Amino acid sequence: MNKEEMNARQKKIRNFSIIAHIDHGKSTLADRILEQTGALTHREMKNQLLDSMDLERERGITIKLNAVQLKYKAKDGETYIFHLIDTPGHVDFTYEVSRSLAACEGAILVVDAAQGIEAQTLANVYLALDNDLEILPVINKIDLPAADPERVRAEIEDVIGLDASDAVLASAKSGIGIEDILEQIVEKVPEPSGDVNKPLKALIFDSVFDAYRGVIANIRIMDGVVKAGDRIKMMSNGKEFEVTEVGVFSPKATPRDELLVGDVGYLTAAIKNVGDTRVGDTITLANNPAEEALDGYRKLNPMVYCGLYPIDSSKYNDLRDALEKLELNDSALQFEAETSQALGFGFRCGFLGLLHMEIIQERIEREFNIDLITTAPSVIYHVNLTDGSNIVVDNPADMPEPGVIESVEEPYVKATVMVPNDYVGAVMELAQNKRGNFITMEYLDDIRVSIVYEIPLSEIVYDFFDQLKSSTKGYASFDYELIGYKASKLVKMDILLNAEKVDALSFIVHRDFAYERGKIIVEKLKELIPRQQFEVPIQAAIATKIVSRSTIKALRKNVLAKCYGGDVSRKRKLLEKQKEGKKRMKQIGSVEVPQEAFMAILKMDESK
C-alpha cells in the first residue's frame, strides 16, 4: 500500500465507544450496530454478543473490554472502517474505561428516555471530555411507555452542557434509529490523527491471556505500523518481545499482515504474563523506539482488601491456582498467602472496589468450584507511629497496639448521588450516619437532584450501596472517586470468644461508633454461634478495654434425674461434679465459628 492509499484509508477510519449507565441499553445497541453493518448474520446473533463471560450476561454488565472492526457503506457511497470499543460502565473499572476512551476519537452517549442521566453516565462523560472525544448523544428506549425524550434532551443540555438538538431518538431493542447513529458517526467523529512514517506508538487498552498463544494485547495504533516479526518494546518496563501475529476482531479474531496508524486490533508476541502488558502502556519498536510514551498510564492499586479462605482446607492449592489464572487476565487483582487461627490457610486479596471483589469471588466459586469463606472487606490505612515512622495496614489484624500509634489516616471518596427529590432527606441522613461531609447539592431539573458528599471509603465498602438502594426504593444512582487520605479517630476492635481473640473477626471502627458497633456484633454472634457444652463469653474489646459482653449459656444435662428424693448433699455433690467437668471443658474447649458469623460483620448496620 503506497502512502496516498494509506492516507485515504486513514480518512475512512472512525474509532468510537459507547458510554452508558448500567441497563440503559449499551450492549443491545452494540448488538444492533453489529447486525446493521453485516458483521454477523441473524443466525449468529445472540444478545450481548460482546459480553462473552456468563457473569456479564447474567448481571447485564460489561466487565472485560472488547473491540470490533466493522465495515459500513454510508449514504455517500463510501465504505468506512468502524472500530467499536466496548467499555465497562461500572465505577470499579474507571481506569479501563479511561484507557479505552483514549483509543477513540468519538463516543456515543446512550441515555435512557425514561430514566434520564445517572451518576455513572456523568462520570464516564467527564472521562470522555478529558480525552477530547466528540460526543454523540443518543436517547434510547423511546418505545417505552414512560419515555420522555424532550425532558431527557433538556437534561443532557443542562447537566452535561452538550448540544442535544440533533440527538438521535432510538430504540436499540426494536432497531429504530440505528442507521441515523451510523451516519452521525461518519459525519461527526473525527478521523484518527497520527503519522504512519513516525516510530510505532501503540496504546494497550486491554489484554487477555490465552493458554496457547500467551497474552493477546488489544491495541490502538497511534503512530507508525506494526507487523508480525517486528521486535517490540514496552515503554513502562523496557521488556522486549517478538510479534508472532497481528490482526483485528471482526468480531472473531482475524489475522492481518500489518496494523496501520488508526487501526484497533490485537497483537500476540509469546508474552507469558499479563503484568508485562499493563493497560495504558505504550508499545514501540525496539530498534526504532518512540521518544516518549503516550501519557495517562498509571499502575492500578487495589482500594479494597479481604481474606479469601477455602471452606474445605484441602482445596488451598486449588484456590491458589484459581487466583493465579484470574490474575493472568486481571492485572489489578493482587493476592498473597496468609494464615488465620480461626480460618486456617487462605489469601489476602486486593481489589479495585466492591463489584470487582464480588465478581472475583463468584468466578472462583463457579469456574473453579471452590466454596469460599470471605472476611469483612477493609481499606488501606496509613498509620503514623510515635517513633516517627509510617506503616500501611490493609488487614485489621495487623493494626499495631494503640500505645505506639500517633495518628491513623483513612481514604476518603467524593460520592455523587443522583436521586428524585422526594428522597433527598433519606440520602442525607444515610450520608450523615456514614460520617459524610456535605459538599454541594444541585437540582438537575424539577424532579432530580445531584448530592455530593465526602465519605470515608471504609463506610462505603460495607453496605452503603444496599442501604442507598433500599432507602430510595432503588431510584438512586451512585458514583465515587478517591480524593485522598484524612486523619480520623480510628480504633481496632477485637472480638474474643471464650477469652481468645478471633483474628478474622477484628475490624477497624471510628471511636464514636465503637460502643454501638461492638454491642450489635456481640448480640449477632450470640444468635449465630451454636450453644456448646460449656458457657461461652463473647466480648468486644478495644485494646484491653471490654466495651460489650454477652454469654452463650451452656447446654446441660439434668444430672439429678436419677435422684428420687434423697439427701440434698447427694444432689449437691452431683451438681458440683458437673460444674467441675464444665470448668475443665471450658479451659480446653474451642468454639466453632460458622460462616454466618463472618458475614454478620458485613451486615452490621442493618440491625440499627
From Swiss-Prot:
Tell where it localizes.
Answer: Cell membrane
Q: What class of enzyme is it?
A: hydrolase
Q: What SUPFAM superfamilies does UniProt report for this protein, alphabetically?
A: EF-G C-terminal domain-like, P-loop containing nucleoside triphosphate hydrolases
Give the originating organism.
Answer: Listeria welshimeri serovar 6b (strain ATCC 35897 / DSM 20650 / CCUG 15529 / CIP 8149 / NCTC 11857 / SLCC 5334 / V8)
Which function does this protein serve? Required for accurate and efficient protein synthesis under certain stress conditions. May act as a fidelity factor of the translation reaction, by catalyzing a one-codon backward translocation of tRNAs on improperly translocated ribosomes. Back-translocation proceeds from a post-translocation (POST) complex to a pre-translocation (PRE) complex, thus giving elongation factor G a second chance to translocate the tRNAs correctly. Binds to ribosomes in a GTP-dependent manner.
SMART domains according to UniProt: EFG_C
Which GO molecular function, any one, fits this protein according to its record?
GTP binding
PANTHER family linked: TRANSLATION FACTOR GUF1 HOMOLOG, CHLOROPLASTIC, TRANSLATION FACTOR GUF1-RELATED
Identification of the protein by name: Elongation factor 4
**Its encoding gene is what?**
lepA
Query: Which family is it part of?
Result: Belongs to the TRAFAC class translation factor GTPase superfamily. Classic translation factor GTPase family. LepA subfamily.
**Keywords carried by this UniProt record:** Cell membrane, GTP-binding, Hydrolase, Membrane, Nucleotide-binding, Protein biosynthesis
The catalytic activity of this protein is classed by the Enzyme Commission as: 3.6.5.n1
Q: How does it sit in the membrane?
A: Peripheral membrane protein
Name the InterPro entries for this protein. EF-4 (IPR006297), EFG_III/V (IPR035647), EFG_V-like (IPR000640), EFTu-like_2 (IPR004161), G_TR_CS (IPR031157), LepA_C_sf (IPR038363), LepA_CTD (IPR013842), LepA_IV (IPR035654)
